Amino acid sequence: MTGYFLPPQTSSYTFRFAKVDDSAILSVGGDVAFGCCAQEQPPITSTNFTINGIKPWQGRLPDNIAGTVYMYAGFYCPMKIVYSNAVSWHTLPVSVELPDVTTVSDDFAGHVYSFDDDLTAQLYYP
């Protein structure tokens, strides 16, 4: 999943995967998720993930794996989630804690947007 997170306030935002089965990464930022106006292009090969969770074959990951990113209000910030699952059915619960301590879970309407690659608006790149 790719999109642009629009922070309502200038502050730190904590993204969280409640449970990962089998692997998931979250990348936030222009040099990590995807380049300016390149949401539909091949991925950047950065391994500087905001959250990196890969479950061992014979074990499990801790719950609530989190990563925090500082963002500026009103600037669209690229984000990408890559999720894989093997053997059995599962989902990836995703949430973000806003500066006012409100938690947004799974439905990111009003927070994450998608645009054509010819976007001309200002984007934030940390």
UniProtKB/Swiss-Prot annotation:
Pfam families: PA14
InterPro entries per UniProt: PA14/GLEYA (IPR037524), PA14_dom (IPR011658)
Superkingdom, taxonomy of origin: Eukaryota
Family note: Belongs to the flocculin family.
Disulfide feature: none
Domain PA14: 1-110
PROSITE patterns reported in the protein's UniProt record: PA14
Disruption phenotype: Leads to cell death when overexpressing the camptothecin mimetic TOP1-T(722)A mutant.
Official protein name in the record: Topoisomerase I damage affected protein 8
